[in-house]
Amino acid sequence: MVKVILNGCSGKMGSVISNLAETKFPNVEIVAGIDNNTNAQRSYPIFAKPEDCNISYDVLLDFSRADALKSLVQFSKKTKKPLILCSTGYTAEDLKFIEESSKEIPLFRSANMSIGINLVNNLLKKVAPVLYENFDIELVERHHNQKVDAPSGTALLLAHTIQDSLNEETKLLYGREGIAKREKNEICVNTVRGGGIIGDHEVIFAGDGEVIEINHKAISRDVFAIGALKACEYMADKTKAGKYSMDDVLQLNF
């Protein structure tokens, strides 16, 4: 049995993860939660801060906000247990901190936990270099009106994957305005916020005579929860410090 502490247990994703752990993952048990809202109805105790939690566990799973990062890393270092980061909105300084922390603890990070997005991300490594010479590349990401970070972490993941796959130097733009001709080396990430859109990411390769679109739509938050719980199963026995991702969980390398 994999024992999990869930940070952000009272939020929307916390509810979904808690439910799926009980109904679909017999080898995973949420043994405690961490959240500012300690009054949520859960089958496990909820603590306001990591340092208040004294429950024995195997994996610390975070689905909250970027500002929880340092306290979670500190807790994982103290307990010598793996940390799974599923939050987005990290700054450049945060990412550097994550990189350094992975030298001390087993640290898993993914901008998107869905199997589909991670397949798309790996597909882009092959597709982008083939199409770049004759196609312009644009991205559109759409999310609900409560999402606070823009562009989404997933959009940045896809954009950076495309950049890293190309031999030429490219520059990212975030939205367009004004009067200017598009430059060949631009990759523009466009953001939409509205309604209850769970998550929609579209990569557009626009050529003179044809357009190729690679699109992923999340129609249920279950896809993120399933990925997160699979990551918990994968990370439970990890003791060696290092960086881990969904590529490791899904054994993606194509």
From Swiss-Prot:
GO terms for cellular component: cytosol. GO terms for molecular function: 4-hydroxy-tetrahydrodipicolinate reductase; NAD binding; NADP binding; oxidoreductase activity, acting on CH or CH2 groups, NAD or NADP as acceptor. It is found in: Cytoplasm. GO terms for biological process: diaminopimelate biosynthetic process; lysine biosynthetic process via diaminopimelate. InterPro entries: DapB_C, DapB_N, DapB_N_CS, DHDPR_bac, NAD(P)-bd_dom_sf. NAD(+) binds at residues 8-13, 35, 86-88, 110-113. Its EC number is 1.17.1.8. Its main location: cytoplasm. Pathway: Amino-acid biosynthesis; L-lysine biosynthesis via DAP pathway; (S)-tetrahydrodipicolinate from L-aspartate: step 4/4. The active site is at 143 (proton donor/acceptor), 147 (proton donor). Catalyzes the conversion of 4-hydroxy-tetrahydrodipicolinate (HTPA) to tetrahydrodipicolinate. NCBIfam families: dapB. Belongs to the DapB family. This is 4-hydroxy-tetrahydrodipicolinate reductase. It comes from Clostridium perfringens (strain 13 / Type A). The gene is dapB.
